[in-house]
Amino acid sequence: MSKLYIIAGCNGAGKTTASYTVLPEILECREFVNADEIAKGLSPFNPSSVAIEAGRLMLKRIGELLSAGVSFSVETTLSTRSYINLIQQAQNQGYSVSLIYFWLNSPELAIERVKQRVANGGHDVPAPIIRRRYRSGLENFFRIYMPCVDYWMLADNSCTPRVIVADAFRLGDEVHIYNQ
């Protein structure tokens, strides 16, 4: 069965960093579609200047992978409802959809992590946007996305090592709480 992995969390939550280990080594997923990484490939010194083009290329690549029935992963903050159609389309095509949400214990920690990323040459996100996405992404995870995926996991990535807080298969199944 083909699988779609959605790697989610606020800006600075460690999604990309975790993806480079978790996806290939643990989940055996070799296709990772990430608009930020596409933008860096298009314009390494000014990725924000090609964000729209990177988004188009991301959508095109997702379509190609779905058409081929290949397992793949996407990265998102879940701050909008834009992944609902992808989830439904993938499930209609026989994909199993798993959502891994990397949570941080405060928007201030997210802001600090983004500052560290920028200091190391990574892309910036303004603090007001981080705060907005922190709130909306977490709300959308619980209200919109958890009910429609085949499996979800909530991991606290506030410190090292990350801690799995809870997970469940399908809505209505027993939720396993590992760490409160």
Residue ranges and their predicted role:
Residues E53-L104, G137, M153:
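Glycine-rich phosphate-binding loop used to anchor ATP phosphates in small-molecule kinases
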Residues R143-Q180:
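NTP-dependent small-molecule kinase module
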Residues I6-G9, T76:
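The Walker A (P-loop) glycine that initiates the GxxxxGKT/S ATP-binding motif of P-loop NTPases
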Residues G12:
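Walker A (P-loop) phosphate-binding loop of P-loop NTPases
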Residues Y95-F141:
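A glycine- and Lys/Arg-enriched "phosphate-lid" helix/loop adjacent to the NTP-binding pocket
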Residues M1-Y5, A68-V70:
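Pre-Walker A (Motif I) flank of P-loop NTPase domains
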Residues S19-V70:
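Conserved substrate/cofactor phosphate-moiety recognition/catalytic segment
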Residues K15:
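Conserved lysine of the Walker
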